[in-house]
Regions:
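Cytoplasmic juxtamembrane amphipathic helix immediately C-terminal to a transmembrane segment
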Residues: 18, 22, 39, 43, ...
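Extreme N-terminal signal-anchor transmembrane helix of membrane signaling/transducer proteins, especially
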Residues: 3-4, 13-44, 323-327, 331
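Membrane-interface helix-start motif
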Residues: 306-325
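Membrane-proximal amphipathic alpha-helices
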Residues: 31, 35-92, 104, 280
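Short, hydrophobic beta-strand elements of compact beta-sandwich sensory domains
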Residues: 185, 194-204, 278, 285-312
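Short hydrophobic alpha-helical segments used for membrane anchoring or interfacial signaling
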Residues: 110-116, 224-227, 231-239
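HAMP signal relay modules and closely related sensory coiled-coil linkers
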Residues: 343-385
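Extracytoplasmic/periplasmic sensor domains and loops in membrane signaling proteins
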Residues: 93-100, 104-175, 207-221, 242-277
Length: 385
């Protein structure tokens, strides 16, 4: 037994083993470690690049929303100060004039009201309060169904959405969303010497032109069922009220809801979400930001995002190619290293065998190595002589 362990110990300490370890450890251990570290760093950089991409796209969407809000306010304020509205009032065609201007400005409603006819319910809006004190103001606010009915029955009908059960959303017993998200503006206007308020607005529920324009600005192409990679959505709280995310074919995911994780971060905590997120039925690299009303309350979210799958496949293929290249290096260079190592330990093993023969009494034993074999061959020659 002792002879066995002694032999094993000597074998472990043999030159052959040491040389093999020296030759193969860098290839079999160090290189894989370096490769894993490199892949991990590359993977993080790649993910950061995707996040930076969606962040810039979210900024474009936010700027467009702000531009619409600003343009709506500027247009209504300019109209209130124009001579055209005064002339229309003098000619008794104010209603026709407002209807034409509403269509020209792309508004969903435009009307003039007297301060005394504005009930307490309408006066709750800071936008209206500001106009009553002589200053125009524009904001995004939530209108209850009754508010919309007072303006136009068609707006109440446009706003209503049946809620669709959505995977990963916060559980809710609510079956429909009847409120409307409105960009509304109010400006003071003088009609025949009487101070009044010019009010106008754009309903964002089912406003597909608005959301498709955002998608075109961000992704430079129109989203279709066949190419749904770039998406944009407007949320009223956590409900999709305008979106080009598809449920299937050309059916938009109106009435579906955001995931509980995103709702908590954006609506509850006021954070901007820049990460992967589950959107209706797939994973997207997503950007969400909160939308605030005139009371500085979070009332919804603006979202842009693109499918993760194409980028995940590119990343998977790239990592696979790195490992294939590494394995190819091993296949090519391990035989080379073994051959180089063999050029060292083979002469040494031959010398060891020769010395053992001499120890057993065979004085004719010789190494007979070629002297051109380097330093080891020189040592072998001296031993032979």
């Amino acid at each position: 037994m002792m002879n066995f362990w002694s032999a094993l110990y000597r074998r472990k300490r043999s030159v052959r083993l040491q040389l093999l370890v020296m030759a193969l450890v860098p290839l079999m251990v160090l290189l894989p470690v370096l490769l894993v570290m490199g892949i991990s760093r590359w993977n993080n950089d790649y993910n950061n690049l995707l996040i930076a991409k969606v962040e810039s796209e979210l900024q474009v969407a936010e700027q467009y929303l702000q531009r619409i809000v600003g343009a709506t306010g500027t247009s209504v304020e300019a109209l209130a100060a124009s001579l055209a509205i005064q002339k229309a009032a003098e000619d008794g065609r104010l209603n026709d004039f407002l209807t034409a201007e509403k269509d020209a400005l792309g508004l969903d409603f435009l009307s003039i009201v007297q301060p005394k006819s504005i009930d307490e319910h309408m006066q709750k809006w800071p936008v209206v309060q500001s106009a009553l004190t002589g200053t125009a103001r524009t904001a995004v606010d939530l209108f209850e169904a009754d508010d919309l009915l007072m303006i136009d029955v068609a707006l109440a009908e446009q706003a209503e959405l049946i809620l669709i059960p959505t995977e990963a959303a916060v559980p809710s017993d609510k079956v429909a969303e009847t409120r409307g998200m409105m960009i509304h503006t109010a400006a003071p206007v003088s009609i025949n010497g009487s101070q009044r308020v010019l009010m106008g607005g754009i309903l964002l529920n089912r406003n597909l032109d608005f959301i498709d324009t955002i998608n075109t600005l961000v992704y430079q192409r129109k989203n279709t069922a066949e190419d749904p990679r770039g998406t944009a959505t407007l949320f009223l709280e956590d409900v999709r009220i305008s979106t080009n995310v598809r449920l299937f074919e050309n059916v938009r995911a109106l009435g579906t809801r955001v995931s509980a994780e995103v709702r908590s971060a954006v609506l509850d905590q006021g954070q901007t979400w820049l990460d992967r997120a589950f959107v209706v039925n797939d994973w997207y690299i997503s950007g969400y930001l909160p939308i605030y009303d005139s009371f500085d309350q979070r009332i919804g979210m603006l979202y842009v995002g693109f499918l993760e799958e194409p980028f995940r496949l590119v990343k998977r293929d790239a990592i696979a190619m790195m490992w294939i290249a590494f394995i190819g290096v091993l296949i090519v260079f391990i035989p080379v290293f073994l051959r180089l190592a063999g050029g060292i330990f083979s002469p040494l093993e031959r010398m060891t065998k020769t010395m053992r023969r001499v120890e057993t009494g065979d004085l004719t034993a010789r190494n007979n190595l070629n002297r051109t074999g380097g330093e080891i061959a020189e040592v072998s020659h001296h031993l032979d002589t």
